[in-house]
Structure formats: C-alpha cells, structure tokens
Amino acid sequence: MNPFRWGFRAQFLLGFLACAGLLAYAIYVQLHLGLEPCPLCIFQRIAFATLALLFLLGALHGPRGAGGRKAYGVLAFIAAGVGMGIAARHVWVQIRPKDMMSSCGPPLSFLSETMGPFEVFRTVLTGTGDCGNIDWRFLGLSMPMWSMVWFVGLALWALYAGFKHRGPRKLF
C-alpha cells in the first residue's frame, strides 16, 4: 500500500499516528529510561501535540473541498514550522562549545509559577537550562536532531496531503 495514493483522511490519520507514536516514545523515555525533559524538550512535545491535534481534526473532518484540505495542510505546516524552530534552537544550544554555555536555569515549573506565559516562553528560548546536555543518541543524532527531522518530514507530509490534486470522486 502506497500512502502517497491514499485519500486525505487516511494521510492525515497517518500523520496523527506518527505524532502520537513520537509522543508515546518521549513519555517512555522519561518514565522508563529516566531522562527528564528540559524546557525546550517540553516545548517540542507541545508542538508535536498541536500537530497531532491538527492532523486528527483534519482526518475526522475530511473536508470535501480543496480549500479546506489546503487550510488543514497549511495549519499543520505552521505547527510543524514552530516545532522546527524550537528544535533548531535546541540543536544550536547543544552544539555550542561548553565554555560558551550559561548556567542552568530554573525548572519550567518554577518559571510558570513566577512569570507570565510569554515571559516563560521568552526565558526558555533565550536561556539554556539543561538543554545543552546530550543524554541520548540514535545513529549519531541527539533527540532534538531527530525531532527536527520528524518536524521537517511531517511538515512536508502535511503540505503534500493538503495540496495533492484529487480528481472527482468516483462511485466505482
């Protein structure tokens, strides 16, 4: 079965399942392997969850018109783009020389209790926290690098599914 030939709903359902699988693996790594997520990791999870929600809504709605499919494709692409930006920042923090790293910041729970949401977002993206540590690798890539690969792939998948030309529906 070639997923490039599937209908919009099936393609968006596949995108949802990919995001759900990635989130499930992140929770597994946290709970069973004992790797605590840094603030940037948590923001990437939020981006994957947002992307999963958009894929699921698109799959459940299954708009008949090209405009609706394109809207879902663009919204999912934007969510993946935000995730790509966060993952890129995380990769940049990880590849910086250790002597250029600033001290670890407070945990996200403390930040959310003492600051507003926009200040927390700005602080997390400008600080490093524990985000410079590389505790996990697969095929030589760290988890934020893999997140970036997945965000790119899912962004392209959303655009493909949303903008694919679909001929008139045939009954048989």
Swiss-Prot record:
Q: Which cysteines are joined by disulfide bonds?
A: C38-C41, C104-C131
UniProt GO cellular component terms: plasma membrane
The protein's matches in Gene3D superfamilies, at most eight in alphabetical order, are given as: DsbB-like (1.20.1550.10)
Q: What kind of membrane protein is this, topologically?
A: Multi-pass membrane protein
Segments on the Periplasmic face: 29-46, 89-145
Q: Where in the cell is it found?
A: Cell inner membrane
Residues exposed to the Cytoplasmic side: 1-11, 64-70, 165-172
Q: Name one GO biological process term.
A: protein folding
Query: Which Pfam families does the UniProt entry name for this protein?
Result: DsbB
For this protein, what is any one GO molecular function term? Answer: electron transfer activity
Q: Note whether Lyase occurs among the keywords.
A: no
Q: Which UniProt keywords apply?
A: Cell inner membrane, Cell membrane, Chaperone, Disulfide bond, Electron transport, Membrane, Oxidoreductase, Redox-active center, Transmembrane, Transmembrane helix, Transport
Give me the segments passing through the membrane: 12-28, 47-63, 71-88, 146-164
Q: What functional role does this protein have?
A: Required for disulfide bond formation in some periplasmic proteins. Acts by oxidizing the DsbA protein.
The entry assigns this protein to a family as follows: Belongs to the DsbB family.
Q: Which PANTHER family match?
A: DISULFIDE BOND FORMATION PROTEIN B
Q: What is this protein called?
A: Disulfide bond formation protein B
Q: Which gene encodes it?
A: dsbB
